[in-house]
Swiss-Prot record:
GO biological process, one term: bacterial-type flagellum-dependent cell motility
Keyword Signal tagged: yes
Protein name, as recorded: Flagellar P-ring protein
Superkingdom of origin organism: Bacteria
Length: 373
């Protein structure tokens, strides 16, 4: 579990308090571009199976990984090398899966990054070269072809009695390692209307986006369909030029509405609360009970000429201490900053604060959803 110095915690608390105060003072606005995506404009995932060669004995064990051996034989036969019946002994080849994201509106001949991951028992892909690997989409068509030298973020070194590993040496990346061979057709300029898909579904935010667009255009061209979708009808002056229309729309400022939510990460003790968190009237008390037990055995030694026996007498000390905390009353409609200040005034740490927030929620006095990660 990570530990932080008291000084670092104080600095973080001060920075968080300043941020919270500034957030309460003025509501932030965001561009529509940062709140929603254009429906249909997205990346597409690609995947392929290939071979990495040139490894320094750290590749797959062919006797243990049959698909690597079969792939190597098939590749050599396509190259005109007949090895049927021959015994292949090499540790310089590894079977890999190649993945990448085809960007929206990617044109034929442009390049994209790919990630290469070992599929067998290869120990290290350092220094390897990926051979030509077709990348397929969900429809089974080839959209790109990848090949190139791998860049590995981790490493592994071992001797006869010790081994050290840093990072993940069985995963590599090839920057601009794939060439796009097929384009995905998407006639944006011929669409009569466009839909905006909100990244965080919310009725109020969807309505505000539609209102901002209508105010900008002077017509009712935008309509919220549901909490996550706003439909835009392209005006006559932008017909056939949806790019110019969307460029103007994306820059409009909207104040998004946020649901009152508290995010709790119990593993690290991190608590994140939104600005709209409110609590009803509730009394909070917190105390810690500590039980300490110490053992100090006493040895009884008889006189040298006596016939007595040395004995050990147990001696236990039990102490009970309780940190007394005052009962604090949290008034109705308290804001986030007031809640944090009040709980800090009780000397409550992050771990105890998690339990208190859950208890307040169970009592029905907190107006927010609590999400535990």
């Amino acid at each position: 579990m990570p530990s932080f110095s008291p000084t670092l915690l104080k600095l973080a608390a001060a920075a968080l308090s300043a941020l919270l105060l500034s957030g309460v003072a003025a509501s932030a606005t965001s561009r529509i571009k940062d709140l929603a995506n254009i429906e249909g404009v997205r990346q597409n995932q690609l995947i392929g199976y290939g071979l990495v060669v040139g490894l320094n004995g750290t590749g797959d064990t062919l006797n243990n990984i049959p698909f690597t051996k079969q792939s190597l034989q098939a590749m050599l036969e396509r190259m005109g090398v007949n090895i049927r019946g021959a015994t292949i002994r090499t540790g310089n080849v590894a079977a890999v899966m190649v993945t990448g994201n085809l960007p929206a509106f990617a044109t034929q001949g442009t390049r994209m990054d790919v990630t290469v991951s070992a599929l067998g028992d290869a120990k290290n892909l350092q220094g390897g070269t990926l051979l030509v690997t077709p990348l397929l989409g969900a429809d089974g068509n080839v959209y790109a072809v990848a090949q190139g030298s791998l860049a590995i973020g981790g490493f592994q070194a071992e001797g006869e009695a010790a081994k050290i590993t840093r990072g993940v040496p069985t995963v590599g990346r090839i920057a601009n390692g794939a060439i796009i061979e097929r384009e995905i057709e998407f006639a944006l300029n011929r669409l009569p209307n466009v839909r905006l898909a909100l990244r965080n579904a919310d009725f109020t935010t969807a309505k505000r986006i539609a209102a901002a667009v209508n105010d900008f255009l002077g017509t009712k061209s935008a309509e919220p369909i549901d909490p996550s979708t706003v439909q835009l009808s392209i005006p006559a002056e932008f017909k056939g030029n949806a790019v110019a229309f969307l460029t103007e729309i994306e820059q409009l400022q909207v104040e998004p509405d946020q649901a009152a939510k508290i995010i709790i990460d119990e593993r690290s003790g991190i608590i994140v609360m939104g600005r709209d968190v409110r609590v009803a009237t509730v009394a909070v008390a917190q105390g810690n009970l500590t039980v300490s037990i110490s053992e100090s055995p006493q040895v009884s030694q008889p006189n040298p000429l006596s016939r007595g026996r040395t004995t050990v007498t147990p001696n236990s000390r039990i102490g009970v201490t309780e940190d007394g905390k005052k009962l604090a009353l949290v008034k109705d409609g308290v804001s986030l900053q007031q809640l944090v200040d009040g709980l800090n005034g009780l000397g409550i740490g992050p771990r105890d604060l998690i339990g208190i927030l859950q208890a307040i929620k169970a009592a029905g006095a907190i107006e927010a959803d609590i999400e535990v990660m």
